[in-house]
């Protein structure tokens, strides 16, 4: 920050830290997310099935999707699938929406849903790292002074 602009107050810092905690909680899977994601996968397989899958095939496909999507919260997966069903995933050809997305494509769609949260989180963390210019100058000068003092010994 430039001279004359105050840094964050302690109260503002606590508010930013609280918001960071909230966002981190939102973007991490929690509680019953695994059950919800399994239900969403079952819905997806039924809605987009091009052929009848055996129970074993469904089990294997579900395990692959769950492994790929392990770090995705259920709400992001739900939003990504709703966009898939509506044909509104950027960069996907119209005819691809007739089938289930690959696990990689679904992960990309989930990441798209999480992007705004992750960007806000990065911005807030950066805000906490911002120091007043006088403090930065003092820190930069301090090691230089220490090095000079060591050289004179």
Tell me what each language-model feature is.
Residues 1-153:
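Charged interaction scaffolds used for protein-protein
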């Amino acid at each position: 920050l430039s001279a004359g602009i105050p840094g964050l107050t302690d109260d503002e810092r606590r508010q930013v830290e609280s918001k960071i905690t909230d966002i981190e909680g939102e973007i991490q899977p929690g509680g019953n997310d695994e059950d919800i994601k399994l239900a969403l996968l079952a819905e997806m397989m039924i809605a987009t099935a091009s052929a009848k899958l055996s129970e074993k095939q469904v089990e294997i496909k579900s395990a692959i999707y769950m492994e790929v999507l392990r770090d995705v919260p259920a709400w992001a997966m739900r939003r990504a699938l709703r966009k898939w069903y509506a044909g509104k995933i950027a960069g996907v050809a119209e005819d691809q929406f007739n089938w289930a997305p690959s696990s990689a494509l679904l992960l990309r769609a989930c990441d798209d849903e999480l992007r705004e949260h992750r960007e806000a989180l990065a911005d807030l963390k950066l805000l906490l790292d911002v120091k007043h210019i006088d403090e930065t100058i003092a820190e930069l000068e301090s090691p230089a002074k220490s090095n000079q003092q060591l050289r004179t010994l």
